[in-house]
Amino acid sequence: MSLVPQAYLSNFHNRVKNEDVPLFTAAQLSRNKRGKQVNYAEFDTDLLDEFIDKNDEDDLEDDVDDSDGRRRGGDYYDQVDGSDGGAAAAAATAAAAAGLGEDGGIGEGTPGSGDPGAVTGGTPAADTGPDGTNDGTAGTSNPSSELDRIKLNDLPDLESQDDSATPLALLKYPRIRETFVQSRIAISYKDLLGDSIQDPQQVDIESPIMVPIRLNVEFSGHKLADFFMWNLNDHSMTPEQFATILCQDLDFPVLSNPNNSPYTQIISMINEQLQEYETLASLQVPDLHVIINLTANLDSKLYDDTFEWNLNDDSLCPEQFAELVVQDLGLQREFVPAIAHSLHESLLKVKKDWLEGNLNLAHVENKAAFGYTSGIRLDIDTLGASWFPKVEVLSQWEIEKREIEKERNMRRLKRESAKVDDGRSRRRGKRRMDDLETTLRI
């Protein structure tokens, strides 16, 4: 799945907490045919009403190239005279957005008022012929205005748009028009789930206990890979509600009966990981300093760092650490949840090893006398080369190689975990049989 923009992540929070969130979303196949992309664009509700009532998909075509090789756009199409009203105004507006006359002829020159077929408004243009086309003899323009039109065609100047006068003026830009045509209305989450979502301000939330969640869902040729943090003490949303919202945004069917549906897989994965990490996440450990080897990759960038972490120190949480790292290294904002999630996973793994007695503490050598903690350590030989963060840009081959190695390591860890659990159950069963035989002898 393509990387979700940070704006979409923040909008997810806004749509949960607020009601007035107009949004267009679209989930479609990506170029590699293996993922889905989520396109979104905020819109005005009045603009949506005008778009639904007065437009048709046939009128929303791409801008047409004129005979002189220029693409008409920007302020070339001004507002439509609304005196005719009704469908005529809507048709004229759509024609203006496409650069066409009412009969389909291509307008040339500066738009102006005239006979039917000419785009109204602006500098008066020449009279049109009987076929509705404009000969363009009266329209004059200077190079600076033409340059401004080209710039506006490529990058729309949204601040100069008068939405009150022309609510459909933005549809002349191809990207915005494409969003309207290929997208659908995304309703508010409260309208989707009713009043089942509780307001966190009205719920007594204890200190947060964060659990890292990782999703790997396959459905109908699509593969969803996602990771996020889940607060065990925040009961304002259930895994079922989260799965409903996620499937709604990605245009997946919300079905609970099929076992292989994405809705069922998401709920099952979240519940399994919550049950697995619930005890470890809430476990309080003594003052314990451990060395963390942290890696987080996003797109083609790989972040690698080694540092010492105190498990009993709450003055710095992984989220704050990730914020500082991203600011210091100038990374993109999507690295904040990636680094925080990876650090939470590493800390839970250390807690699990410590609880099972398998933790090998790799303490940094302390050269202070009489057991005192030394101050700043100076590495004269390597100058601390292994203790500073590194960011590498990987090639496509290196990314695929890392993914394959990660899958192999995951399978190996699962096999080792299964062997350990099987050995423990066998030893437990053997002890029970020995106790039973001893009891029978007595």
From Swiss-Prot:
Gene giving rise to this polypeptide: SFH1
Organism: Kluyveromyces lactis (strain ATCC 8585 / CBS 2359 / DSM 70799 / NBRC 1267 / NRRL Y-1140 / WM37) (Yeast)
Comp. bias intervals (Basic and acidic residues): 415-424, 432-442
Pfam families associated with the record: SNF5
Protein name, as recorded: Chromatin structure-remodeling complex subunit SFH1
Biased composition (Acidic residues): 54-66
GO cellular component terms given for this protein: nuclear chromosome
InterPro entries from the UniProt entry: Sfh1/SNF5, SNF5
Chaperone among keywords: no
Sequence ranges of Polar residues compositional bias: 134-145
Region (Disordered): 54-84, 102-148, 415-442
